UniProtKB/Swiss-Prot annotation:
Necessary for the introduction of cis unsaturation into fatty acids. Catalyzes the dehydration of (3R)-3-hydroxydecanoyl-ACP to E-(2)-decenoyl-ACP and then its isomerization to Z-(3)-decenoyl-ACP. Can catalyze the dehydratase reaction for beta-hydroxyacyl-ACPs with saturated chain lengths up to 16:0, being most active on intermediate chain length. This is 3-hydroxydecanoyl-[acyl-carrier-protein] dehydratase. The active site is at residue 76. It catalyses: a (3R)-hydroxyacyl-[ACP] = a (2E)-enoyl-[ACP] + H2O; (3R)-hydroxydecanoyl-[ACP] = (2E)-decenoyl-[ACP] + H2O; (2E)-decenoyl-[ACP] = (3Z)-decenoyl-[ACP]. Its main location: cytoplasm. It is found in: Cytoplasm. Keywords: Cytoplasm, Fatty acid biosynthesis, Fatty acid metabolism, Isomerase, Lipid biosynthesis, Lipid metabolism, Lyase. It comes from Haemophilus influenzae (strain ATCC 51907 / DSM 11121 / KW20 / Rd). It holds the Pfam family FabA.
Amino acid sequence: MQNACTLNKKSSYSYDDLLASGRGELFGKEGPQLPAPTMLMMDRIIEMNEETGAFGKGYIEAELDIKPELPFFGCHFIGDPVMPGCLGLDAMWQLVGFYLGWIGGKGKGRALGVGEVKFTGQILPTAKKVVYRIHMKRVINRKLVMGMADGEVEVDGRVIYTATDLKVGLFQDTSTF
């Protein structure tokens, strides 16, 4: 992986930084990219490091401001708006992939799986803020760069989703994936 100094690693990232990642400008054209809006599931990353988290192998915390006009509320479900749970899960995968780029990994990010996901609440258009927390468990840096983490999604101070063994890989060639 690249030297951290060449990446200009920061411990937090603005919305504009996240958009730059989606354009391939943050980690370079060979690094992983976040999706662009409307699939980008966070507004900012407020903390990133390689030392803390539940396993002492890295931690990421990001936030999404909830606004009633977010696109999914208009169609999921009509008259009963709720953020699809799969979008919270995807946000956690997005953050694991971002972490792999942040530490210098190269390739296109792809979600590879999750051990277990539990949903114990929901995100409604009346909510104010979603917080994602990712606890890195392991990073493999061989032919395939892969990260494994546990994560949680909190809305307005209450944890509502948990996921174990989130897996994301970085691939040089995705044509046969």
